[in-house]
Amino acid sequence: MRIVNENEQVFEWVNAKGKSPVVLVCEHASNHIPAALNGLGLSKAELKRHIAYDIGAAGVARALAQLLDAPLILNRFSRLIYDCNRAPEHASAMPEVSEVFSIPGNKNLTADQKQQRIDEIYRPFHRALEDALDKRAARSTPTAVVSIHSFTRIYHGQRRKVDLGLLFDRDDRMAQAFGAGPEGFVTMSNEPYGPANGVMHLMNVHGYARGMQHLMIEICNDLIESQAGQIEWAKHLAGPLAKIAEKLGDAK
């Protein structure tokens, strides 16, 4: 039995023909779990929590795509089925435990079950992004890859002070160019996560490997729970990213 119906797409493109050099990605956009997986054994309340998706990230990404005239790809399925920001061999790609929550539907998966999720979720999403970047490269279109994420204020009982995280691994060009972040908020590099946490998979595969500038952006989800907050933060991000995009365009 398929997880994803044959008439369903794993991904959604928004503003696919956008003119900006920035290509936006939101791989944790949705908490959707197909009926075939019976909610992975989780309650509706649990599926509304951060464990299932990045709260507010999709709204920020959609608003930002409009402000920048940038193409945006979103994942239409929950990261609990398969986390598209993890390599297939990574332990948290199909987590049995997320934060303090047990994920019954991910317990004791067979090799075939894991491969099915890789084939139906991971590969189509990454192939769609890869194809889009290939086409831009073939046209010599200046391109930078930016992914939009959110995180929780409280994690394992500890309060996080950071509001905006700029994440990078071996290439910090875009983080440096982004600057100090919006006034009145705490912006930090590689917080609350960093390369050591295995979170740079998508950026390394689609950004670093191509020599493209890239940046993973993390916003505390208590700032973007509402539509107003999502629009506000899209505006906060749009200014620095538009300047970076302008320089990329000038360098063509």
Features from the language model and the residues they span:
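N-terminal catalytic or cofactor-binding beta/alpha core of small enzyme domains
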Residues: 1-145, 150-252
